Amino acid sequence: MFLGLIPIPTPISLGIQNGSVEDCFPFKRSNLIRYQIKNMNKTICNNSPPIISPFTSIIHFTLLFTTSNSPSQSFFDTIEKNESRKGIYMKLISWNIDSLNAALTSDSARAQLSQAVLQTLVGLDADIIAIQETKLSANGPTKKHLKVLDELFPHYETTWRSSIEPARKGYAGTMFLYKENLSPKITFPEIGAPSTMDAEGRIITLEFEKFFVTQVYTPNAGDGLKRLEERQIWDKKYADYLTALDIEKPVLATGDYNVAHNEIDLAHPSSNRRSPGFTDEERSGFTNLLNRGFTDTFRYIHGDIPNVYSWWAQRSKTSKINNSGWRIDYWLTSNRIADKVTKSEMIDSGTRQDHTPIVLEIEL
């Protein structure tokens, strides 16, 4: 079939599964408009609506060809050539769960809200899920925890890091769930942080062939800012750590950073100038981190959109109803791959207060 002779819209089918195709038709003389397909999140720039086949690995869409702009090489040869150089599409989620044990084993009203959020995450089918504030014992998840996780997320591997002595027991802690087809090298870095911070299970890093995925649960400055000086040291050490990773290969960094970077990132900036998470010192620390070569992907995608937050205080029963929130959870990337991000946003967690999950979609 010589498609260049067809002057009317012609349906073409491509088999695409868990991947991305971008600029598959780079004909210099063609009037084809650039398009992207992102793992079933489709943007067809010629406004031809995609039709989802009953076979989900196939997407039908319409392309326009004219005689004057016919390609000089085989249409399907071009597809094959460009398919061979497409990137790696990934969906990643991060969530401060505020007690994994409660979310997995309790039947309290709050636990039921957490379980509903977990079901939402199940449906999103992420490649990697980062979890902060697991609050597990030094021995990590129990057999019961692992059983429930396996029921929720079959075909995922689990790695975790708990708070250990001399740090407090059942405090902080992080965990990754990642699909079993992935084979990262896992490290549990210590960054030379003050006090017991390095023993509190705050960082896990996954190393892949071409990039790092790392998560953090940044220490809170504490009531009365009693930990603010230590927090400032932490911020510098953490920035040094991410920079060292970035020298090797691009970085995707996520977690609860316990800081609202700018006034737009919380509902009531004027009354929180000396509140933990919005002090000048903490904000400056985050600015320094970004200045070391990292991008806040939410702002990169959404610009200065206001009133979008990732955390609402549990102490106030109306904080979420009134949207009196803070944006303190982030997906960061190395600057040089920020343009690969296609989505960075919050995931709806219903009426549950505290943190809501955040999602990143990227083609590396």
Where are these regions (language model features)?
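Intrinsic low-complexity, disordered N-terminal segments enriched in polar/charged/small residues
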Residues: G4-T10, N31, K38, P50, ...
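N-terminal, active-site-proximal structural segment of metallo-dependent hydrolase catalytic domains
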Residues: Q36, F75-D150, W160, P166-Y171
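Active-site beta-strand/loop signature of hydrolases that rely on acidic residues for catalysis
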Residues: W95-N96, L121-P141, V213, Y241-E263, ...
